[in-house]
Every structure is written in structure tokens, then in C-alpha cells.
Curated annotation (Swiss-Prot):
Keywords: NAD, Oxidoreductase. The keyword NAD applies. This is Altronate oxidoreductase. The keyword Glycosyltransferase does not apply. GO terms for molecular function: mannitol-1-phosphate 5-dehydrogenase activity; tagaturonate reductase activity. It comes from Yersinia enterocolitica serotype O:8 / biotype 1B (strain NCTC 13174 / 8081). Pfam families: Mannitol_dh, Mannitol_dh_C. Its EC number is 1.1.1.58. One of its GO terms (cellular component) is cytosol.
Length: 483
């Protein structure tokens, strides 16, 4: 079977216009996939040079396949139909290992065609390292590497205003563009680079904050043989992802034209502020995940897919989103409902087996960040508590008993909560404390919640009553009132 390469698989090629820090699965099934579509359907004509930002030879370089690889996109489309598309991605030209090819890396700065920078160096990537020096080849941190590259460009083109870049980091931190910009400016100061360089950075380079959303399941180990037989070639960089994707960019409106987004209907939004979109994702997608996990797991289910196939639990999830989360969010209702439907389709994706216990990791923190804001806003706006969100809290407390149908299961959270719940539930079991006392202890932990939740009118009483029903009647019977 042939291995992918451009000689045996000829097709479109594009000049280098994009530098990408990060060779991982996510960017390849997200940014590179979108650029490939734009190259095919518009005159963007942009090739990508991938920079491997860490010193490792594993996995092998994309250059071993001349930058070619296959993206397999699968899930439920807008009509609820299961779809699968295999696409040979030609947008990546080559990969550079910055630790072996530093001169080739710096040469990119001298290419007048380079215009865009994308990155995904993980949440830990946009960080300061005091030890990084300008003379390092390369410096260790991503922002320092980028600063060195930008200075090379500034010098080569004598600070030309039209040679700045549009920088679009995709790391999962708030306002990632602003964070990256601040660190680049900090390195410029730390290294005592000319003031003219700092001025060029701020005036002629555009750092955009982004929000990225797509579940990328990566290399499909269990299906490789079947997929390669179907494709007719060997591909060491197969990459799988869900059907849904969303790319929100906080940046100038002209960016849509420059990226040719006005010529192809991709799910990319250029906005003035990404914050409402971040809140929407956290509240609806992540919030629904967090709400459903203890309810579904204690109802005898193990995956998100099983949850959505279960009439009772899926009804609970849908009503939680549409009746208690969406009404308190600050975006147009039609956008919120459309996003909600997309989320439910994603949960139903038959190609992804998402284990509930893996999502349950750090459930207490997830409840605080993903659900509590909507619970409190609902209570303030409506003058009453949202019954399903409080039920989700009661279910979460029940989940930390660590027992389902007489069998124990692993709990993953910080030691503080694991020890505390173990003590509290043992106290209830042996009659040393009442259920109301357990609930009050959990809700009054101001260090965790940022406030004393027992001060929220009726919250402790409502959660205690719901928890009592779960204990007495079982989750199935208890959730029936909210489905």
C-alpha cells in the first residue's frame, strides 16, 4: 500500500503564507482543515509551515508525508443524519523542527508572503520564562520564540508597516491574543530591543483573541486498518474529529475579507468581544455535560451517547438547557437556541464514546465555574431557584458517595473534597449527622464557592429535599419530576 506523498498523490500546492506553532491533532483537524477548504473554494491560496515548538522527534514529522494527511470528519449534521467525510488535507507544506532547523525557522521571518500565525501550544504554552535569552537558538517558551521571529522580520524589512502579521493563538485561555501580545512586549523589554520594534509590534501587528470549539478525537487506532483499506493508502497522520466546529475571532472586520471568509460559508465569526461566546460555550456545552453526568451515571448509564438515547435523561438535559440556562445568557435567543441544538447533536454523535466517569473529573470545580453562575442569575432574575440546576447539584453531592447499585466507582477530584465527602457520607451512613447538615457543610464552603451558598434563599432546603428523594427513591424515580 502506498504512503502519502506529493509525487504519488499530486494536487493543489500553495505558497507559504501561514506559520503554525503546534503539529498536534487539534490544529490539523481545525485550522488546517478550514484553510484547506478555503484554498479549494476561494483564492486564499495559503500554504502552512508547521513549527514543532518542543524538542522531540515523536511523533515523526509531517514532512515524511510531504505535509499530506487525511482528516476524517464524522457526526450528526444539521438534519440529524450521521455523516462521515474523509478529506485529503493539502494546506500544510512542511514541518520545521525549531531545535534542529533554527536557521530555516528564522528564514520564515524574511519571507514577504507570510501573513498569518496560528498556534496551539496548550494552556501552559502562553507563559513567561525568565531564563529565555535573545541569543538562545531557540529560546524555550513559545512567546519568546515568537518574539525572536518577529524581531527578525522587523529588522529584515526595516520596520515596514505592511509587513506585520495577524496572530491568532488558539490556546484555551481567556483572551489568548491579549495574553500573547503582553508576553511578546515583555520579552521585547526584557531583551532591551529597540523602542522602534515595540512601536512596530503594537501598531503593525494584530493579536486576535480566539475561541475554538471542536472535539478532535485524533488518530483512530482501532480503525486504522479499515480506514486505510478504504482510502487506498497508508497515512500515519490520520486525524478524526466531530462534524461540529466553531471558530470565534475577536479582531478587525477586514479580517473576513483577508481570510476570504466572505467567499465561503464557514462557521467562523469575527466579533468585537469573544466573552459572550465563551460564556455560551461554558454554560451550554460544558454546563450541560456537568449537569448530566451524576444524573445519568446514577441512573445506570455510562456514556454521553447512552444518555441521549435514554428518553427520560435526554429530556432532563434538553429542559435544563432550554428552560434554565439559555434564558439567563446575554446573546440573541435564536443564536443560543441554535447553539443548543448543535450541542445536543454533538452529544448524540454515534462516532464518539464519551465516558461519563472521565467527564466527572473535578466535578466540584466544574459545577462552580459552569453551572453556579447560571443558577444564581436565574434566582436573581426570576425570584426563584431553577429546579433542574439545583437537582444537578443534589445529584452531584449524591455522586460523591461513590456507590452505584451497591458497587463502588472511582472518584477523581482534589483531596480536600474526596476526604470531606468520605467523612460526611460516613457520618450520614452511621447516623452521626443528618442529610441537611451534609448539604449545609458543602454549600457553606466559601473557599470553594467564593461565597456562602447557604445564604441563597431556599437553596439549602431545596437541595436537601432533592437529595433526600434521590437517596430514598433512587435517581430514576427522583429525576422523573424534572423530565
Amino acid at each position: 500500500m502506498q504512503t502519502l506523498n506529493r509525487r504519488d498523490f499530486p494536487g493543489r500546492s500553495h505558497p507559504d503564507k501561514i506559520i503554525q506553532f503546534g503539529e498536534g491533532n487539534f490544529l490539523r483537524a481545525f485550522v488546517d482543515w478550514q484553510i484547506d477548504l478555503l484554498n479549494e473554494h476561494t483564492d486564499l491560496n495559503a500554504g502552512i509551515v508547521v513549527i514543532r515548538p518542543i524538542d522531540t522527534d515523536f511523533p515523526p514529522s509531517l514532512s515524511t508525508q510531504d505535509g499530506l494527511y487525511t482528516a476524517v470528519i464524522r457526526g450528526l449534521n444539521e438534519q440529524g443524519e450521521a455523516v462521515r467525510e474523509s478529506r485529503l488535507i493539502r494546506s500544510v507544506n512542511r514541518e520545521i523542527n525549531i531545535y534542529r532547523q533554527f536557521d530555516e525557522y528564522l528564514a520564515l521571518a524574511r519571507d514577504p508572503n507570510i501573513r498569518f500565525m496560528f498556534s496551539n501550544t496548550t494552556e501552559a504554552g502562553i507563559a513567561w520564562n525568565e531564563a529565555d535569552q535573545f541569543s538562545d537558538a531557540p529560546p524555550s517558551s513559545f512567546p519568546a520564540k515568537l518574539t525572536r521571529l518577529l524581531f527578525e522580520r522587523f529588522e529584515h524589512f526595516s520596520g515596514a508597516a505592511d509587513k506585520g502579521w495577524v496572530l491568532l493563538p488558539c490556546e484555551l485561555i481567556d483572551y489568548n491574543g491579549e495574553a500573547l501580545r503582553e508576553l511578546v512586549l515583555r520579552y521585547a523589554s526584557h531583551w532591551q530591543l529597540p523602542a522602534a520594534f515595540t512601536q512596530w509590534l503594537t501598531e503593525n501587528n494584530t493579536f486576535c483573541s480566539t475561541l475554538v470549539d471542536r472535539i478532535v478525537t485524533g488518530y483512530p487506532r482501532d480503525e486504522v486498518a479499515a480506514l486505510q483499506a478504504e482510502l487506498g493508502y497508508q497515512d500515519s497522520f490520520l486525524d478524526t474529529a466531530e462534524y461540529f466546529y466553531l471558530f470565534v475571532i475577536q479582531g478587525p472586520k477586514e479580517l473576513a475579507q483577508e481570510l476570504r471568509l466572505d467567499k465561503l460559508d464557514l462557521n467562523v465569526r469575527i466579533v468585537d468581544d469573544i466573552k459572550p461566546y465563551k460564556e455560551r460555550k461554558v454554560a451550554i456545552l460544558n454546563g450541560a455535560h456537568t449537569a448530566l453526568v451524576p444524573v445519568a451515571y446514577l441512573s445506570g448509564l455510562d456514556t454521553v451517547g447512552q444518555t441521549m438515547d435514554d428518553v427520560q435523561i435526554s429530556s432532563f438535559v434538553e429542559k435544563t438547557i432550554t428552560e434554565e440556562i439559555v434564558p439567563v445568557l446575554d446573546l440573541p435567543e435564536d443564536e443560543l437556541l441554535s447553539f443548543s441544538q448543535a450541542v445536543l447533536s454533538r452529544f448524540r454523535n454515534p462516532f464518539i464514546q464519551h465516558q461519563l466517569l472521565s467527564i466527572a473529573l473535578n466535578g466540584m470545580t466544574k459545577f462552580r465555574t459552569r453551572i453556579l453562575p447560571q443558577l444564581l442569575t436565574y434566582q436573581q432574575q426570576q425570584g426563584k431557584l431553577p429546579p433542574r440546576l439545583t437537582f444537578a447539584l443534589a445529584a452531584l453531592i449524591a455522586f460523591y458517595r461513590g456507590e452505584r447499585d451497591g458497587q463502588t466507582y472511582p472518584l477523581q477530584d482534589d483531596a480536600h473534597w474526596l476526604e470531606r465527602y468520605s467523612t460526611l457520607w460516613n457520618g450520614v451512613k452511621h447516623g452521626d449527622i443528618k442529610l441537611a447538615e451534609l448539604v449545609n457543610t458543602v454549600l457553606s464552603d466559601t473557599a470553594h464557592w467564593g461565597q456562602d451558598l447557604t445564604a441563597v434563599p431556599q437553596l439549602a432546603n431545596q437541595v436537601t429535599e432533592q437529595l433526600q428523594t434521590i437517596i430514598d427513591s433512587g435517581m430514576r424515580a427522583a429525576v422523573a419530576a424534572y423530565s
